[in-house]
């Protein structure tokens, strides 16, 4: 199983390579994008299969589609916004020279200067131009614009292409810090003679004739602030929607969450884990407006709290339904286009029953259900969840090790994983092993020793899930080879002993 997003879907050759090298199931995370993007992803997979047939490379199987419901994921609410300098980083080689130009746009109709991430477009930023909008039409391909960035460093921008009357594609070869009011000048006008002695030059300091010969940078898009905390700090979680704010002399830092009703289930000394356990805290006090936490980890360094990061309450019985109204709406699309649906945060057998009832309402009683076990309650109720799953025509389990490790403790993950595998084998239910399988390989191109051993254990499951990354094809190749090798001497949890050198073909010529 491989997680596929819209970026991968728009790379036909990449999809073909994933299919050829062993991708049997494509996973779509419904927490991202919309039905429009999901349909593009599914159509791209089917088109890739057709192309392989036409090339005589038919893989002999149809890739299944699993779509994960978002579920009731508890996240940090929004933070206060602030305009800070925008850093555009250029990658350098060992000699300090730019490996390649970083591309962006000058846009006289853009409201903000900001980073962008457009699928299939290499450009990574937009510089909004706030004056003399028609001046962009006078720029020539190959022309250079000069400026002093927010640090006072002299920088050059190269004109690469005219997109239209208001957008110019540009390139930079040195790291650049941008802020509102910076002046871009055509190189031939000798910027050095006009540069004001400090780097705070802005539009108000220039005469009207000078402004006519220059491009003035528009405002930077405000970004969410980040809160820094360390062991011993206090942090408030508000029960109302209040934007996250830093600490002051008189009050601690504060945040909100997207599901404030769960805060009524929290008790004194319960743990609250932030951002996949990177920050640990305990509840010190509770009132009608907020709960007060004391940060207990990290002990020596500071950690950053960002908006939209996860919140976990491993000691609290939150009693929240596993299916949201948004999930029910998404089901209408899923049953028509996918093979199975993944139910996030399965805590109780009643969650399975609720989802199955929705599938019956939609006329798809035989549709596949995959229960994702990723919470403390999910583990405690696993036996009843499995028995309920046996009453559903098509049912399986996914071991979601990310939240599961945070909720149950990293030191317990291995034992819990083993218990889930054994129980599922006993009741003859298929298992998907997920989260951080060959993640370093998929992202960097080189695996760690530990994750190779971890991936090989995936033979114990019916399927192994990989997340996306630059080297995802390499990860699929290696995982496929590992699982086929392990298959020779393992049947589920039973080991079959064979001659070592024959098993691994060490001395084959």
Question: Positions of the model-derived regions?
Answer:
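Non-catalytic helical/linker scaffolds that mediate oligomerization, partner binding
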Residues: 1-509
């Amino acid at each position: 199983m491989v997680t596929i997003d819209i970026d991968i879907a728009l790379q036909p050759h990449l999809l073909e390579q994933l299919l050829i090298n062993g991708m049997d199931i494509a996973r779509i995370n419904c927490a991202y994008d919309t039905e429009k993007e999901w349909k593009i992803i599914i159509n791209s997979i089917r088109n890739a299969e057709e192309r392989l047939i036409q090339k005589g490379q038919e893989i002999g199987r149809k890739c299944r589609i699993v779509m994960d419901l978002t579920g009731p994921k508890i996240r940090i609410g929004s933070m206060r916004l602030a305009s800070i300098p925008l850093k555009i980083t250029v990658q350098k080689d060992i000699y300090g020279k730019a490996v390649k130009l970083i591309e962006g746009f000058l846009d006289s109709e853009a409201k903000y200067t900001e980073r962008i991430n457009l699928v299939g477009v290499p450009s990574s930023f937009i510089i909004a131009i706030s004056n003399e909008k028609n001046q962009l039409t006078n720029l020539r391909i190959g022309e250079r614009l000069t400026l002093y960035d927010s640090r006072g460093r002299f920088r050059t921008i190269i004109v690469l292409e005219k997109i239209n009357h208001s957008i110019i594609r540009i390139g930079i070869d040195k790291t650049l810090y941008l802020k509102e009011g910076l002046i871009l000048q055509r190189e031939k006008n000798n910027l050095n003679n006009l540069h004001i002695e400090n780097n705070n030059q802005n539009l108000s300091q220039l005469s009207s004739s000078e402004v006519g010969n220059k491009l003035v940078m528009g405002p930077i898009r405000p970004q969410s602030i980040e809160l820094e905390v360390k062991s011993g700090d206090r942090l408030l979680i508000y029960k109302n929607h209040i934007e996250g704010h830093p600490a002051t002399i008189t009050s601690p830092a504060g945040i909100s969450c997207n599901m404030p009703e769960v805060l009524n289930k929290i008790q004194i000394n319960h743990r609250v884990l932030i951002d996949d356990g990177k920050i640990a805290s305990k509840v010190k006090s509770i009132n009608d407006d907020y709960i007060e936490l004391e940060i207990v980890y990290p002990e020596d360094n500071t950690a950053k709290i960002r908006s939209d990061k996860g919140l976990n309450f491993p000691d609290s019985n939150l009693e929240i339904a596993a299916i949201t109204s948004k999930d029910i709406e998404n089901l209408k699309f899923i049953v028509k286009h996918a093979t199975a649906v993944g139910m996030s945060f399965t805590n109780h057998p009643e969650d399975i029953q609720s989802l199955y009832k929705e599938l019956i309402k939609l006329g798809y009683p035989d549709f596949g259900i995959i229960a994702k076990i990723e919470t403390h309650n999910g583990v405690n109720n696993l036996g009843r969840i499995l028995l309920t799953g046996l009453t559903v025509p098509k049912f399986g389990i996914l071991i979601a090790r990310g939240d599961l490790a945070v909720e149950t403790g990293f030191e317990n993950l291995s034992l819990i994983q083993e218990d889930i595998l054994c129980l599922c084998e006993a009741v003859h239910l298929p298992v998907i092993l997920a989260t951080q399988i060959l993640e370093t390989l998929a992202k960097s191109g080189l695996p760690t020793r530990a994750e190779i051993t971890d991936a090989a254990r995936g033979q114990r499951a019916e399927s192994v899930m990989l997340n996306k990354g630059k080297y995802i094809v390499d990860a699929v190749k290696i995982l496929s080879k590992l699982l086929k090798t392990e298959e020779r001497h393992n049947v589920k949890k039973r080991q079959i002993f064979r001659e070592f050198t024959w098993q691994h073909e060490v001395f084959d010529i």
